[in-house]
Design a protein with these regions (language model features):
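Glycine- and aromatic-enriched mobile tails/lids
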Residues: 1-162
Length: 162
């Protein structure tokens, strides 16, 4: 029952907001922040900036988003507002996760963590785990849980693409 009340209050806030900025504007701005700061190549400075930028964008979203239409009935803009609100939280959490993982591995390259030859530098001694983040309200308050990865049939080793 409490969850239903929270969702209804959130939807009513979107409709009654009287903001002046379309949902799509926030969606595009979030995409730009993620593309520029949390892509395949990333660094501590850009990730830290992205977290601050997304947090500010999220605050602006709730203050200024315009959602036309009614609360009940077909309203694709209301649906979109809910999705973008979720994406703002997810984007901030993705940046937080990328900032916490101080290694280069797989498809993501931390510029601070590379070999002398410019290859991705793994840190298997510290990062052989799956990250699972527990929601605690705000993305900045999410709690990291680590699930250890155990390899039985392969050997972990530094890759080289040369």
């Amino acid at each position: 029952m409490e969850a239903e009340k929270e969702v209804k209050a959130r939807l009513e806030a979107f409709i009654g907001n009287n903001g002046d900025t379309p949902v799509d504007d926030f969606h595009r701005r979030l995409g730009r922040i993620m593309w520029e700061n949390c892509g395949m190549a990333r660094n501590k400075e850009d990730l830290t900036q992205a977290i601050a930028d997304i947090s500010a964008l999220r605050a602006e979203f709730y203050a200024k988003v315009r959602v036309p239409g009614r609360l009940y009935g077909y309203n694709p803009e209301l649906d979109k507002a809910g999705r973008v609100a979720d994406l703002l939280e997810l984007g901030e959490l993705m940046c937080k996760d990328a900032l916490e993982r101080e290694e280069s591995c797989g498809g993501h390259f931390r510029e601070e963590h590379q070999t002398e030859e410019g290859e991705a530098l793994r840190r298997d001694d510290e990062f052989t785990f799956v990250s699972a983040w527990q929601h605690k309200g705000e993305p900045k308050d999410a709690e990291l849980h680590k699930e250890a990865l155990v390899y039985e049939n392969i050997e972990l080793k530094q890759r080289s693409y040369k």
